[in-house]
């Protein structure tokens, strides 16, 4: 099967974020709460269109992938997140980039997320 041309592929954006919380959280906790927050704020159909994925999370910082047309909705759903595992928490978006490499270099220097 032939690969799609780059112009026909789904375009993505990468949101660098930091977790501000009372207690540390794991990647699986963040995935669960981000999807729950997006689903309750946006609904199931729009959440599916956002195509949200948590790519990496270490030391309270990480990267989330989403559709390039749904960046605003994704940021809104992250802002609506107030609790992780029953403890007060919020995700602060540090910035948006078109590549994982640039998001890591620009927003997550010295953090070890996706570092070789």
From Swiss-Prot:
Enzyme class: hydrolase
Compartments reported by the entry: Cytoplasm
Documented EC number(s): 3.1.26.5
Biological processes annotated in GO: tRNA 5'-leader removal
Pfam families per record: RNase_P_Rpp14
GO cellular component term of the entry, any: cytoplasm
Gene3D superfamilies linked: Ribonuclease P, Pop5 subunit
UniProt keyword list: Cytoplasm, Endonuclease, Hydrolase, Nuclease, tRNA processing
GO MF term (any one): ribonuclease P activity
InterPro entries: Pop5/Rpp14/Rnp2-like, Rnp2-like_sf, Rnp2_archaea
Catalytic activity: Endonucleolytic cleavage of RNA, removing 5'-extranucleotides from tRNA precursor
Domain of life: Archaea
PANTHER family per record: RIBONUCLEASE P PROTEIN SUBUNIT P14 (PTHR15441), RIBONUCLEASE P_MRP PROTEIN SUBUNIT POP5 (PTHR15441:SF2)
Annotated function: Part of ribonuclease P, a protein complex that generates mature tRNA molecules by cleaving their 5'-ends.
Assembly, per entry: Consists of a catalytic RNA component and at least 4-5 protein subunits.
Homology family: Belongs to the eukaryotic/archaeal RNase P protein component 2 family.
Protein name: Ribonuclease P protein component 2
Organism the protein comes from: Methanosarcina mazei (strain ATCC BAA-159 / DSM 3647 / Goe1 / Go1 / JCM 11833 / OCM 88)
